[in-house]
C-alpha cells in the first residue's frame, strides 16, 4: 500500500460479532419471557396487534427454546448423562419465571407457550385454595395484584402456583393478631378433647330450639362461600380485645369445619328424610347448591348428607364455628329422627304411657 491511500477494512464480520455479542449479553429472563425486558432502557416491548408479527414472535421464541434444549442435550451427552425430557426442560424453565418483570398482572397476559394451559378441573381446585388464602388476610395482600376483571382469559398453572406461594408467604410472616377473620384462626379456643358423640349429647342441653331463620343462617355458613366469609367477619364472632372471657364459655369455644361435618354425618344416619323435609324443607329453595364444591342438590336431605361428606369436609376444615353454631345443627337434625317420640305421637298410638320431654337449659 502506497502512502496516502486509505486502507479498506472489512467491517461486516465485526458487525456480525458485535450483534451476536449484544444478543448474548441480554438477561436470560429477557430472552425467555414473552414480553422482553430491554437491558438499558428498562422499557417493555409491547406486542404488535398484527397477527403475522405475533406468529413470527412465537416462532422465534420456539426456536430459542429448541436451541436451549439442544445445548442442554449436548451438555448431557458430553457428561455421559441421558438427555432430559420435555417435562424436565419445562420444570427447569420455572426457575426463570419472574412475573414481576411483566407490565401487567399474570391473569391479564397472553399464555406463555412454555407452560401448558391448566385444565378447568385443576384450575378450580387451585383457584379455590388461592381464594381461601386471599380472604384470610386481605389487608396484607393489597400490595399484590392477582386480581383481574377479565373473565375469559387463559392462564398457565405456574401463574396460579406463583400467587399461592406469594399469599402463603404473607400469611406465614403475619403476626397472629393480623388475621382479620377470626373464624379462620386455628388457635381460637378449639376444643380437641370432646368427641363427636359427647358434643351431640351436651349440645342438646345448652342450645335453644332454633327457628327457621337461625337454621337458614347456620346452613349458609357451611355450604355458601359468601355466607361463610360474612359469618367469620361478624362482630359477635370476633374475640373481645377489652375483656378476657373464660375459655370454658360456650360462646367462645370454636369448632373446626371438619368437626361440624362429622357431627352432621353422625346425625344423618338417624334422620328421616320425610320428617326433615316436612319441618325445614321450605328452606331448600335458598339452599339447593354448595358453592364450595359447585354442586346442586335435589332435596334438603341430600344437602344435609353433603355437609357430612368428606368432599365438603376437606373444603371447610380450616373454618372455625362457634359451639352454638354446631349445636344448632344438632338440634334441628335431632328433631327429625323417628326415634324421638313426642306426647302427641304416643297419644295417637293409643298408649296411656306418659312421656316427659327432656329439660332444656336455654342460654342466651
Curated annotation (Swiss-Prot):
GO terms for biological process: endosome organization; endosome to lysosome transport. GO terms for cellular component: early endosome. Residues 19-31 have a biased composition (Basic and acidic residues). One of its GO terms (molecular function) is phosphatidylinositol binding. InterPro entries: PH_domain-containing_F. Residues 1-17 have a biased composition (Acidic residues). Residues 1-61 are annotated as: Disordered. This is Uncharacterized protein K11H3.4.
Amino acid at each position: 500500500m502506497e502512502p496516502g491511500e486509505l486502507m479498506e477494512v472489512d467491517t461486516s464480520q465485526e458487525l456480525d460479532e458485535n450483534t451476536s455479542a449484544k444478543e448474548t449479553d441480554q438477561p436470560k429472563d429477557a430472552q425467555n419471557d414473552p414480553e422482553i425486558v430491554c437491558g438499558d432502557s428498562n422499557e417493555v416491548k409491547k406486542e404488535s396487534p398484527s397477527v403475522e408479527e405475533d406468529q413470527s414472535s412465537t416462532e422465534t421464541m420456539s426456536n430459542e427454546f429448541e436451541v436451549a434444549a439442544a445445548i442442554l442435550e449436548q451438555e448431557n451427552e458430553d457428561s455421559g448423562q441421558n438427555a432430559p425430557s420435555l417435562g424436565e426442560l419445562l420444570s427447569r424453565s420455572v426457575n426463570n419465571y419472574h412475573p414481576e418483570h411483566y407490565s401487567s398482572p399474570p391473569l391479564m397476559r397472553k399464555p406463555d407457550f412454555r407452560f401448558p394451559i391448566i385444565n378447568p378441573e385443576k384450575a378450580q381446585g387451585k383457584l379455590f385454595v388461592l381464594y381461601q388464602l386471599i380472604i384470610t388476610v386481605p389487608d396484607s395482600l393489597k400490595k399484590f395484584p392477582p386480581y383481574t376483571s377479565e373473565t375469559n382469559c387463559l392462564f398457565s398453572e405456574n401463574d396460579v402456583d406463583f400467587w399461592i406461594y406469594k399469599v402463603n408467604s404473607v400469611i406465614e410472616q403475619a403476626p397472629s393478631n393480623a388475621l382479620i377473620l377470626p373464624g379462620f384462626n386455628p388457635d381460637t379456643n378449639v376444643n380437641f378433647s370432646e368427641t363427636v358423640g359427647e358434643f351431640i349429647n351436651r349440645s342438646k342441653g345448652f342450645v335453644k330450639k332454633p327457628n327457621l331463620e337461625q337454621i337458614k343462617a347456620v346452613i349458609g355458613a357451611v355450604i355458601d362461600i359468601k355466607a361463610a366469609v360474612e359469618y367469620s367477619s361478624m362482630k359477635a364472632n370476633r374475640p373481645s380485645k377489652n375483656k378476657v372471657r373464660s375459655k370454658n364459655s360456650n360462646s367462645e369455644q370454636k369448632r373446626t369445619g371438619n368437626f361440624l361435618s362429622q357431627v352432621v354425618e353422625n346425625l344423618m344416619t338417624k334422620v328421616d328424610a320425610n320428617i326433615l323435609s316436612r319441618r325445614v324443607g321450605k328452606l331448600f329453595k335458598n339452599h339447593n347448591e354448595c358453592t364450595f364444591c359447585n354442586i346442586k342438590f335435589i332435596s334438603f336431605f341430600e344437602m344435609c348428607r353433603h355437609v357430612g361428606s368428606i368432599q365438603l369436609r376437606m373444603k371447610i376444615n380450616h373454618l372455625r364455628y362457634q359451639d352454638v353454631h354446631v349445636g344448632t345443627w344438632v338440634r334441628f337434625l335431632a328433631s327429625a329422627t323417628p326415634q324421638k317420640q313426642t306426647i302427641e305421637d304416643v297419644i295417637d298410638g293409643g298408649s296411656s304411657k306418659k312421656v316427659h320431654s327432656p329439660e332444656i337449659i336455654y342460654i342466651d
